[in-house]
C-alpha cells in the first residue's frame, strides 16, 4: 500500500493516468464507430432516406419499425436487397392480410425506383444477397449442351415442387410451388438465392451462377415449345387427349372384354 501511495505522488502519475483513459476511450470508439457510421450513411443517402420513408408506411406495421419482425411477419435483418426486389417486383408484397402463401400479382404495384429505394434501406439492416447484375443470370450465348445440362439440374433440384416443365404444383398446408412460365430471369435468380416462403435457399456454393444460367435457359426453352391445343396437364399431355385415351379407349376395351366373356358363357 505504501508502494502504491508513493507511485501516486510521482510526477508522471497524472499524465500516465490521462493517457490510459484516452486509450480506453479510443478502444470503445473503435467498437462503436462502425455502427454510428452505418447510421450516418442511412441518414445521408437520399435513396436510403426515401426507402426508409416508404418502408415506414408500407412495411413497418408487419415487419417492425426496425425490420426486427413481429408475430405477423418475419425479420428483414439480413435478407438483403435481392429479397425485397423479388417480393415487391413480383407483387407478392406488401400483403394486405396474412395468408398461407403470398400470391403473385396480389399486392399494389410499385415503381422500380420505389422498390430500389426500399431494397437499399433493407440492405442497411444487415448483410444479405444484393440485387444481381445481368451478367449473373442472363442465359445469352449458352450452347445446346449447356441448356440440356440446365434441364438435368432443374429436374434434380426443382422439378419435385415446380413440375418437370416448371408449371408449378401443390405443397402441404395450403401452399403451392408457383408456375415459372412467365417469371423473369432476374426474379428466378433472386428466388434461388433468397428462398422465398417455403422455397429453400440455393447459395452459390450449392448452385454456382453458371448452373443458375443453365436452369434459366432451360426454362426459357420450355416456354418456347409449341403448344398444340387442348388443356395441358403440366406437360404430361393435353387433358382432352388423355381423357379420351384413358376413359373412352380403355373403358371401351373393358366393355368389349366383358361382352365377349358373357357371350362365351352363354355359348356353353
PLM feature segments, named:
Residues 1-6, 23, 27:
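Long, compositionally biased, intrinsically disordered
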Residues 2, 98-168, 185, 198-268:
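Flexible coil segments in periplasmic/lumen-exposed cytochrome c-class electron-transfer proteins
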Residues 3-18, 47, 242-248:
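N-terminal export and membrane-targeting signals
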Residues 14-31, 252-253:
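Hydrophobic membrane-insertion alpha-helices, especially the h-region
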Residues 26-34, 258-263:
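Short hydrophobic alpha-helical membrane-anchoring segments
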Residues 29-53, 70, 127-153, 173:
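Electrostatic cytochrome c docking/interface patches
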Residues 48-52, 64-108, 151, 163-205:
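Gly/Gly-Pro-rich "capping" loops immediately C-terminal to redox-active cysteine motifs
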